[in-house]
Amino acid sequence: MNLKNTLKQYGITSIWHFTDASNLASIEKYGLLSLDLLAQQKIHVSCYGGDELSHRLDRGKGLDKFVHLAIIRDHPMQYIKVKNGIIKNPIWLEIDTSVLFENESGCCNQLANASSAKCYKIEHLEEVIDLNTLLNKPHWSEPVRKSQLIVANKIDYSKILGVHHG
C-alpha cells in the first residue's frame, strides 16, 4: 500500500514533535530545523530535547540531518525529558503529514538513534511500525511507543497545524 493510503487507512492526519515552549519563537521564525541546520545557521536553541549523548548518536548515524517526529502525541522520550527536568514547559507541535511527501523521510520502529535501530524509507511505514498497536493506546512499556518518523532538514512553520501544551 502506498503512503497516502496507509495514512488514510489508519486515520493519521497529523504527526507530532515535542519541545519546550521556550523554543517556539525560534521555530516560528526559522521553522523546525534539524540539529545539523541549527548548528550550520548558528541558531540559538533555548532548550534541546536531546542531551549531548543523543546528539552524538544522531551525528554518528547521520540522523542530525533530520527532524525527529512521533506518530502519536505520547512519546516516552517526552515523558523522560519532562520528568528529568530537561523540558520544563512541554508543548507538542501538530504537523501536517504532507511534510512526509515533500522532504526525504523515514521511519523506525524504535528510537532512531538506538544502536540496533535501522531507519527505512517512509514508504515502508506500515511494514516497519505496528500501526494497529501504536494507534490503539498501547501500554506505556510497549516498545512500539518509541517509534519515530524522521524528516530531512526542515519543516516550515506553515506546516505546523497547532501547538498543544502538555
Residue ranges and their predicted role:
Residues 1-166:
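Active-site-proximal loop/hinge segments that shape catalytic or ion-binding/gating pockets
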